[in-house]
Amino acid sequence: MKVVEVKHPLVRHKIGLMREGDISTKRFRELAAEVGSLLTYEATADFETEAVTIEGWNGPVEVEQIKGKKVTVVPILRAGLGMMDGVLEHIPSARISVVGMYRDEETLEPVPYFEKLASDMPSRIALVVDPMLATGGSMISTIDLLKERGCTSIKALVLVAAPEGVAALEKAHPDIELYTASIDDCLNDQGYILPGLGDAGDKIFGTK
């Protein structure tokens, strides 16, 4: 599995701001979208382009446009919605496919409750967004679903990842790509990433 921990100074700075314990919902939400945008920039760096001729201001001009598979953004509800706008900033024409998944606080296992995917998944590149890759369960289950629907090009974008989650994801889906702003130290006994960001969903939405 290709794992990219984005080291750009802007990414490191913004993730640092998100770790503040008393950060406001507004600020956390803004930063989640901003870092999601920067991760999208990295994740799409290998997209192929083709030369096309358009009518410019002074006559025909040759430009480059992205070719190949179209994109679908797959936010994992609910926290993944906080990164979605950052992706759409760069790819506004992307289809939005939604997967509802929550983590059982006792077993730490993912529990699916909703899905609405693009009808042409086999012909699309899926950018799966979720702020936290902790145990990896929700991401693994979501990618399982995407593959069942025929999607073969999948990239996962997360703000913060635990080494345990990275290892679990690589074992389950070695053929995907993972982009993250930070690989943190470890998980605690409750399955939270340390130092982490806290509960990203609660902070993005302002509700528990």
Curated annotation (Swiss-Prot):
This is Uracil phosphoribosyltransferase. Binds 1 Mg(2+) ion per subunit. The magnesium is bound as Mg-PRPP. It comes from the Bacteria. Belongs to the UPRTase family. One of its GO terms (molecular function) is magnesium ion binding. NCBIfam families: PRK00129.1, upp. It comes from Shewanella woodyi (strain ATCC 51908 / MS32). Catalyzes the conversion of uracil and 5-phospho-alpha-D-ribose 1-diphosphate (PRPP) to UMP and diphosphate. Uracil binds at I193, G198, D199, A200. The lineage of its organism: Bacteria, Pseudomonadati, Pseudomonadota, Gammaproteobacteria, Alteromonadales. The keyword GTP-binding applies. HAMAP family: Upp_B. Gene3D superfamilies: 3.40.50.2020. It catalyses: UMP + diphosphate = 5-phospho-alpha-D-ribose 1-diphosphate + uracil.
